[in-house]
């Protein structure tokens, strides 16, 4: 993964993927990236690997590709694109016209409505607000993320916060026991981002101070 989602919203330094690309090229290995969670704009670019200025040989996509309609894709270039020949591999629902049209429309909307810039703007807003309002709070280890994926790492397990947030009508997730993960919709508005901050920051403070 160009960044880890389930692993705790871990964003690597730019040189990490660049080093992998160089290592693979030197040894004639394929660099294969899982962009199921990070791809199709989640990071603020079409692909998260673009932040590192590299190009992999194989990329897997799903989730955001269909805008809610199930679809997955495997992209390949160069020698990797020649591995499968016609008839080598089949899929019962491959090329489903409904799913493919949903994916085409999703890509068009993201492009035509400038959602990549929107993702960057709101993601930066959320992390800036969390850093400001949680500054000095004992037990808050780090706020990190890229685009519209944000992780808030606490010093203690915090899965109980999922239920507490739901009671306030806010859906969050906790990964690796101690990392609050936020993956809001691309169409979230500024006012909704402000609501997230207004609900979540007091919950975190209350949780850590009790």
Predicted regions and their residues:
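Conserved N-terminal phosphate-binding loop of PLP-dependent enzymes in the Aspartate aminotransferase
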Residues: 1-210
